[in-house]
Amino acid sequence: MYKATVIIKLKKGVLNPEGRTIQRALNFLGFNNVKEVQTYKMIDIIMEGENEEKVKEEVEEMCKKLLANPVIHDYEIKVEKIE
Amino acid sequence: MKIAVTKFLGTNCDLDVCHAVKLAGGEPELVFFTQENLDSYKGAVIPGGFSYGDYLRAGAISARTPIIKGLKKMVEEGKPVLGICNGAQIGLEAGFSKGTLTNNLNAKFICKWVYIRVENNKTPFTQYYKKGEVLKIPIAHAEGRFYADDETLDYMYKNNMIVFKYCDETGEVTEEANPNGSIDNIAGVCNENQNCVLLMPHPERASEKILGSDDGLKMFKGMIDYAKRI
């Protein structure tokens, strides 16, 4: 079995209102040194597969078809073998 | 004149849309998302709501259900297809036009009356409006900020794919009149063929005077009359 972890983040230049709101709240709390906050979406997928490379290819396909929106998102995929 | 009104798990504006379609002289029929073949319908409306709880991204799950195949065929055949609010998010996730709708700039759900200006009156839905006409129509969304990169936006302007813009009461497109941070105040778009319009405001909630405005009714009238001719 494999665990694939997909991290979906906004492309550079796309505004992140959630991150900006969190940053403002941190500033309100006195953390005035906080200049930027980014939030990501992380998805763990437990799946069967032949090897790490094949699993990664398949998850890449999942990102293109559903998990990420190519207009605004970049994504990273990490794969590890699990028991 | 049968018009398909799509129903996903979490769609909640379907009956309002059916009412507006009836007012405009059409015959609405609710169609569940599992149905793939929509050949017997002359047009379709994808109503708003919170399909699949907006999980992943608003509209993302709905855009991968069987009915999308039928809707896509309708769009390709030139039949009128209207996506409202969550329906617009679904339509863009399904690739019926370009760009995307994402979280409002103020990170809040916004529910209020706004004014929109007709930028393109060559679509079936906007044929009874004048270019530049100002409509009073409500919005209700958290993910309605239209975004597209510069190249895409350029392409959309060149192909008359911008249909509505948020404006003030006098029709001026200003930053103050932009409720959600949409790029260029864009409130509604269409495909290259102009037969599929996707907008965030709710025309069905402005289809009778008793609701506060009937500015949206002409969208459904335009749709029905166009559908009669094809």
From Swiss-Prot, chain A:
Subcellular localization(s) per the UniProt record: Cytoplasm
Record's catalysed reaction(s): N(2)-formyl-N(1)-(5-phospho-beta-D-ribosyl)glycinamide + L-glutamine + ATP + H2O = 2-formamido-N(1)-(5-O-phospho-beta-D-ribosyl)acetamidine + L-glutamate + ADP + phosphate + H(+)
* Biological process according to GO: 'de novo' IMP biosynthetic process
Q: What's a GO cellular component annotated to this UniProt protein? A: cytoplasm
**Whose protein is this, by species?**
Methanocaldococcus jannaschii (strain ATCC 43067 / DSM 2661 / JAL-1 / JCM 10045 / NBRC 100440) (Methanococcus jannaschii)
The GO molecular function terms of this record are: ATP binding; phosphoribosylformylglycinamidine synthase activity
| Cited function | Part of the phosphoribosylformylglycinamidine synthase complex involved in the purines biosynthetic pathway. Catalyzes the ATP-dependent conversion of formylglycinamide ribonucleotide (FGAR) and glutamine to yield formylglycinamidine ribonucleotide (FGAM) and glutamate. The FGAM synthase complex is composed of three subunits. PurQ produces an ammonia molecule by converting glutamine to glutamate. PurL transfers the ammonia molecule to FGAR to form FGAM in an ATP-dependent manner.
Q: What is its EC number?
A: 6.3.5.3
Q: Which InterPro entries match?
A: PurS, PurS-like_sf
Q: What HAMAP family does UniProt report for this protein, alphabetically?
A: PurS (MF_01926)
Q: Which family does it belong to?
A: Belongs to the PurS family.
Q: What is this protein called?
A: Phosphoribosylformylglycinamidine synthase subunit PurS
Keywords in alphabetical order? ATP-binding, Cytoplasm, Ligase, Nucleotide-binding, Purine biosynthesis
State which gene encodes it. purS
Domain of life from the UniProt record:
Archaea
UniProtKB/Swiss-Prot annotation, chain B:
The record's GO CC annotations read:
cytoplasm
Biological function: Part of the phosphoribosylformylglycinamidine synthase complex involved in the purines biosynthetic pathway. Catalyzes the ATP-dependent conversion of formylglycinamide ribonucleotide (FGAR) and glutamine to yield formylglycinamidine ribonucleotide (FGAM) and glutamate. The FGAM synthase complex is composed of three subunits. PurQ produces an ammonia molecule by converting glutamine to glutamate. PurL transfers the ammonia molecule to FGAR to form FGAM in an ATP-dependent manner.
Q: Which Pfam families match?
A: GATase_5
Quaternary organization = Part of the FGAM synthase complex composed of 1 PurL, 1 PurQ and 2 PurS subunits.
- Indicate the segments forming the Glutamine amidotransferase type-1 domain, all copies: 2-230
Do you know which InterPro entries this protein is assigned to? Class_I_gatase-like, PRibForGlyAmidine_synth_PurQ
| Keyword Manganese set for record | no
Q: Catalytic site residues?
A: C85 (nucleophile), H202, E204
Q: Which PROSITE patterns match?
A: GATASE_TYPE_1
Q: What is this enzyme's EC?
A: 6.3.5.3, 3.5.1.2
Protein species of origin: Methanocaldococcus jannaschii (strain ATCC 43067 / DSM 2661 / JAL-1 / JCM 10045 / NBRC 100440) (Methanococcus jannaschii)
Q: Show the CDD domains listed in the entry.
A: GATase1_FGAR_AT
Give the catalysed reaction(s), semicolon-separated.
Answer: N(2)-formyl-N(1)-(5-phospho-beta-D-ribosyl)glycinamide + L-glutamine + ATP + H2O = 2-formamido-N(1)-(5-O-phospho-beta-D-ribosyl)acetamidine + L-glutamate + ADP + phosphate + H(+); L-glutamine + H2O = L-glutamate + NH4(+)
What this protein is called in its record is Phosphoribosylformylglycinamidine synthase subunit PurQ
Which processes are annotated in GO (biological process)?
'de novo' IMP biosynthetic process
The UniProt gene name for this protein comes to purQ
- Which is an annotated GO molecular function term of this record? ATP binding
